[in-house]
Each structure stands twice: as structure tokens, then as C-alpha cells.
Regions:
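Acidic, His/Gly-rich catalytic cores of divalent-metal-dependent hydrolytic chemistry
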Residues: 26-122
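Short active-site oxyanion
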Residues: 7-10, 75
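Active-site environment of divalent metal-dependent phosphoester hydrolases
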Residues: 12-24, 42-46
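Active-site-proximal segments of metal-dependent phosphoesterases and phosphodiesterases across multiple
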Residues: 1-6
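Short secondary-structure capping micro-motifs at structural edges
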Residues: 8, 16-19, 51-53
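Active-site neighborhood of phospho(di)ester-bond hydrolases with catalytic His/Asp-centered motifs
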Residues: 10-15, 34-38
Length: 122
């Protein structure tokens, strides 16, 4: 629906931080490959704008997509690559953002904080 009358063979999008590939079929028989690679450096966050929501990939890997044009049209693959997430987390902590540091290390919102509370309660 959001593509409207567009019939591009490939549409790249982002901002949601959610890795996803969708093939959209149009009434005229053509298709559009819609690719969102996810996020390179923000694998988890929560927000209340425009509504309360949480996005988590479950690990700290940097996300990206490989898009190729072959004999049978376009294809895409979602990729994940390790990087020095600990260095990024330390930068977040130095900036006073422990919440971001936890997300950078784990790919989850508040996970490390919950684990610390659970261990302390034992």
C-alpha cells in the first residue's frame, strides 16, 4: 500500500532497525523487492513516539544487506557482522548512556540490568 503506484524492482528502506526482506506482488504481475537491512550500530531500543514500542535483534552484530541483480532478477540477503561492540558500549557509558551500552552489548533493552538484579536477588 505504501508503495502506491511505484513499480520499482527494488526499494531500500530503514529507520525501523528491523531486518526484513519482503517481496510485494503488484496487480500488473510485476514485483518489488523491499529490503530493510536493520541497523549497523543500534540493535535494541525502546521509545514511546509515536507509540510505545521496543525493537530488539537479540545480539550485538552489525546488520547490513547484500543486494544483487542476477539472471532471474533481484535478490537480497540479510547479513550480520561482528564488530567491537564493547568499545562502542564503553563510549556510550562515558557519555552517561548505560542503557545504550547494555543494548550495544546484548542486542536487548535492559537485559543486563535484569540479569544483575536477578543475580543480586539470589
Amino acid at each position: 500500500r505504501r508503495l502506491g503506484a511505484r513499480r520499482d524492482p527494488v526499494v531500500l528502506c530503514g529507520h525501523t532497525h528491523t531486518p526484513r526482506i519482503v517481496q510485494v506482488a503488484h496487480d500488473d504481475g510485476r514485483t518489488t523487492l523491499v529490503v530493510n537491512p536493520g541497523s549497523v550500530g543500534v540493535q535494541a531500543y525502546d521509545d514511546d513516539d509515536p507509540y510505545e514500542h521496543r525493537v530488539e535483534t537479540g545480539n550485538p552484530l552489525a546488520r547490513w544487506a547484500l543486494i544483487e541483480r542476477g539472471a532471474h532478477g533481484w535478490s537480497a540477503a540479510l547479513m550480520a557482522t561482528a564488530y567491537d561492540c564493547e568499545a562502542a558500549a564503553r563510549q556510550a557509558e562515558a557519555a552517561g548512556r548505560g542503557d545504550w551500552a547494555d543494548a550495544l552489548r546484548s542486542g536487548r533493552v535492559g537485559r543486563l540490568e535484569r540479569e544483575v538484579v536477578a543475580v543480586a536477588a539470589r
